[in-house]
Curated annotation (Swiss-Prot):
It catalyses: ATP + H2O = ADP + phosphate + H(+). GO terms for molecular function: ATP binding; hydrolase activity. InterPro entries: Actin, Actin/actin-like_CS, Actin_CS, ATPase_NBD. Keywords: ATP-binding, Cytoplasm, Cytoskeleton, Hydrolase, Nucleotide-binding. This is Actin, cytoplasmic. Actins are highly conserved proteins that are involved in various types of cell motility and are ubiquitously expressed in all eukaryotic cells. Its main location: cytoplasm. SUPFAM superfamilies: Actin-like ATPase domain (SSF53067).
Length: 375
């Protein structure tokens, strides 16, 4: 087994990142989606299949209904998830899973039954020789070269703040909100409606997601930016739709991600903001470790990729933290792959060899072995 490269798969709500241990970046990055034809005749004659996965589903989205098997970080549809894993191994990476140890990632607070089901599918359906299931935020911390810190991980389906001390997460202080990339896309569609642009179908929502990812940024001072947007056209940017029409996006560019900082004010949602989530998680920890956490706030995940988000989070946390503490927010440029890179690094360590759940372990103990071996 030692001579077979480990496969590292980070299953996000929105995007699968997969590749090989020891490499710097994932080889395969594709949407965690399955598309099925809205009506059968729509695809007749076009090498029609009954379903499409990942990029292919994305390309044909106009005639498909799009399904996401992972919702808010948790796998909800196991049959579809199995298809995504199958696609990951055989199509994207072109490997035989029974020849490679596999590291899978999971959301913090993942239900125990889910961890067991993942384990069962890997050993029984894919016959992997060895498996490890790692918490996403812990891997992000490793990829930042730290073992202590608090990770603010915002993906497509869920946002978590996870305090970690000496490599172990502190479960009672983990916080989560169901406010992440997908919600920002929906909110962006709402803001565009104000301008008379209507996007509703799953295909149109993919256009909105693209607008959000390409044009949005976080304002350091929201009120000042709003005032400026009324007085000038500084923030206006054009976006060309697939049909060639050009639309102009103005203050929606920073109003959209402001939702993360002011969920109630921006969209009437009684949720914690990301600064409250981070601060509260730190306050839940032992007083002796708080300083270390404040000095190592790590941003991770695609929804933290907005320009200006690190500076704004720093400003918000500094306003709440004790004045004697030097708060530090770390936002590495490729943080959307931080989880995957952490998995690649961890599995490359010689000390990791003893961590695997082997096929023998599984045959002897069943799926519950995952709770003992993967802390």
């Amino acid at each position: 087994m030692a001579d077979k490269q480990t496969v590292v798969v980070d299953n996000g709500s929105g995007v699968v990142k997969a590749g090989f241990s020891g490499e710097d970046a994932p080889r395969a990055v594709f949407p965690s989606i399955i598309g099925r034809p809205k009506n059968v005749s729509a695809l007749i004659g076009v090498d029609s299949a009954s379903e499409y996965i990942g990029d292919e589903a994305q390309q044909k989205r106009g005639v498909l209904k799009i399904f996401y098997p992972i919702e808010h970080g948790i796998i909800k549809d196991w049959e579809d998830m199995e298809k995504i894993w199958n696609h990951t191994f055989y199509v994207e990476l072109r490997v035989q899973p029974d020849e490679h140890p596999v590291l899978l990632t999971e959301a913090p607070l993942n239900p125990k039954t889910n961890r067991e089901k993942m384990t069962q599918i890997m050993f029984e359906t894919f016959n992997v020789p060895a498996l490890y299931v790692a918490i996403q935020a812990v891997l992000s911390l490793y990829s930042a070269g730290r073992t202590t810190g608090i990770v603010c991980d915002a993906g497509d389906g869920v946002t978590h703040t996870v305090p970690i001390y000496e490599g172990f997460s502190i479960p009672h202080a983990v916080s989560r909100i169901q406010l992440a990339g997908r919600d920002l896309t929906t909110f962006m569609a709402k803001l565009l409606t104000e301008k008379g642009y209507v996007f509703t179908s799953s295909a149109e929502m993919e256009i909105v997601r693209d607008i959000k990812e390409k044009l949005c940024f976080v304002a350091l001072d929201y009120e000042a930016a709003m005032k400026q947007s009324y007085e000038s056209t500084t923030f206006e940017k054009n976006y060309e739709l697939p049909d060639g029409r050009v639309i102009t996006i103005g203050n929606a560019r920073f109003r959209c991600p402001e939702y993360l900082f002011k969920p109630l004010e921006m969209n009437g949602k009684e949720l914690d903001s990301i600064q409250s989530l981070t601060y509260n998680s730190i306050q839940e920890c032992d007083v002796d470790v708080r300083r270390d956490l404040y000095q190592n706030i790590i941003l991770s995940g695609g929804t933290t990729m907005y320009e200006g988000i690190g500076e704004r989070l720093l400003k918000e946390i500094e306003a709440r933290a004790p004045k004697s503490i030097n708060v530090k927010v770390i936002a590495s440029p490729d943080r959307r792959f931080a989880v995957w890179r952490g998995g690649s690094t961890l599995t490359s360590l010689s000390t990791f060899a003893s961590m695997w759940i082997t096929k023998e372990d599984y045959d002897e103990n069943g799926a519950s072995i995952v709770h003992r071996k993967c802390l």
